[in-house]
Curated annotation (Swiss-Prot):
One of its GO terms (molecular function) is structural constituent of ribosome. Part of the 30S ribosomal subunit. Forms a bridge to the 50S subunit in the 70S ribosome, contacting the 23S rRNA. Belongs to the universal ribosomal protein uS15 family. One of its GO terms (biological process) is translation. It comes from the Bacteria. This is Small ribosomal subunit protein uS15. PANTHER family: RIBOSOMAL PROTEIN S15, BACTERIAL AND ORGANELLAR, SMALL RIBOSOMAL SUBUNIT PROTEIN US15M. GO terms for cellular component: cytosolic small ribosomal subunit. It comes from Parasynechococcus marenigrum (strain WH8102). Keywords: Ribonucleoprotein, Ribosomal protein, RNA-binding, rRNA-binding. Residues 8-25 have a biased composition (Polar residues).
Length: 89
């Protein structure tokens, strides 16, 4: 369910805004989206894992807040990250 170092580094490299960027909103949204998709697949197999479901809802809320921040700051960055990750239809 968690990301190992190589997967995190790969996500950072694909979504960073400059060379040393590791914590921008884009990178955080990308990492949260990957963790959300992994946890969702875990919950499909383990229906009664309620503590993981609670963690999933917290991650979804955090991603939603970051995306709303990005939409308010820069509409262009928001639409780019949405298109890149494919999280909104």
């Amino acid at each position: 369910m968690s990301l190992d170092t190589t997967e995190k580094q790969q996500l950072i490299n694909t979504h960073q805004t400059h060379g040393t960027d590791t914590g921008s909103a884009e990178v955080q949204v990308a990492m949260l989206s990957e963790r959300i998709s992994r946890l969702s697949s875990h919950l499909q197999n383990n229906i009664h894992d309620f503590s993981s479901r609670q963690g999933l809802l917290k991650m979804i809320g955090r991603r939603k807040r970051l995306l709303s921040y990005m939409r308010n700051k820069s509409e262009q960055r928001y639409t780019e990250i949405i298109a890149k990750l494919g999280i909104r239809g």
